[in-house]
């Protein structure tokens, strides 16, 4: 309303549907009376800005199709990644890897499957632990490095109940500045996120690090990973485990897919590219 009263253009950063995320997180029931009210309020807010920026084409289509926003007002600018910070095995690769595995007392002969992000059910962590049990049963040389918070104790108990506690390490919270070296110490990355209404920025960090990546299939995952990603059936831990096992058993495939994803990240998702797109939007509005 301040922008309207001063007659200055307003740009809205759309991170996902409020109603859809409240339903995803279980804050309200789909049949609640609040559902219609929240949808009405959200729609009104979405119609206020001169331009809306989304982090994926999927989110752009949601605004156009579900909220009837004019296509010319909605611009998809993907989440971006610092491809200079997130690199494949930065610095002295063996030294960095050794530092990480020594820090967490992981046997140095294991292949690491990494996850970096929030620990929550909607992020698919229970599915990841179920998949880990299947993977470790078939490939005892695998180790899962699960980086993030909260809920560490909850998921640790889940891993213990599966009998895989010696093959799963929970690091807790990792600072942004430590994230590149932690990811570079891993061999495979995984993102079992279930929500289709949000972005999935962790995929870009994986890609920039040159990690072969397995994700649950979805529009956002395919938009980011392209043809070089591996897509498991959503919510199916057996499918997730199968894709991880295929990568564990083929070093050449891991290298090829990781290199391809790194190239894609640099070409399409770098900070420089995103900065340029944002600059052009603001310039357009200032000239109106």
Where are these regions (language model features)?
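Membrane-proximal helix-turn-helix segments that form the acceptor-binding/catalytic region
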Residues: 4-5, 18-19, 32-52, 66
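Conserved donor-binding/catalytic core segment of Leloir-type glycosyltransferases
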Residues: 107-132, 145
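Glycosyltransferase donor-sugar binding loop
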Residues: 116, 143-156
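Nucleotide-activated donor-binding/catalytic signature segment of Leloir-type glycosyltransferases, i.e.
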Residues: 154-178
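Conserved acidic donor-binding segment of nucleotide-sugar-dependent glycosyltransferases
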Residues: 229-238, 246-252
């Amino acid at each position: 309303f301040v922008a309207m009263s001063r007659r200055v253009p307003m740009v809205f950063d759309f991170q996902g549907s409020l109603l859809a995320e409240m339903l995803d997180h279980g804050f309200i029931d789909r049949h609640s009376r609040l559902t219609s009210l929240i949808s009405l309020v959200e729609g009104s807010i979405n119609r206020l800005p001169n331009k809306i920026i989304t982090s994926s084409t999927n989110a752009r289509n949601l605004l156009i199709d579900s909220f009837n926003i004019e296509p010319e007002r909605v611009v998809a600018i993907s989440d971006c990644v610092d491809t200079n910070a997130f690199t494949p095995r930065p610095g002295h690769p063996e030294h960095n890897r050794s530092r990480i595995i020594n820090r967490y007392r992981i046997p140095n002969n294991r292949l690491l499957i990494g996850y970096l992000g929030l620990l929550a059910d909607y992020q698919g962590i229970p599915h990841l632990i179920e998949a880990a049990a299947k993977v470790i049963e078939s490939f005892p040389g695998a180790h899962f490095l699960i980086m993030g918070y909260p809920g560490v104790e909850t998921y640790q108990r889940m891993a213990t109940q599966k009998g895989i506690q010696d093959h799963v390490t929970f690091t807790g919270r990792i600072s942004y500045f430590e994230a590149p070296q932690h990811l570079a110490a891993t061999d495979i990355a995984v993102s079992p996120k279930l929500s289709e209404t949000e972005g999935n920025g962790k995929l870009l960090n994986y890609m920039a690090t040159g990690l072969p990546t397995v994700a649950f299939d979805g529009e956002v995952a395919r938009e980011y990973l392209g043809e070089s990603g591996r897509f498991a059936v959503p919510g199916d831990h057996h499918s997730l485990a199968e894709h991880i096992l295929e990568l564990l058993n083929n070093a050449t495939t891991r290298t090829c897919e990781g290199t391809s994803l790194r190239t894609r990240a640099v070409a399409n998702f770098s900070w420089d590219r995103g900065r340029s797109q944002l600059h052009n939007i603001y310039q357009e509005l200032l000239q109106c």
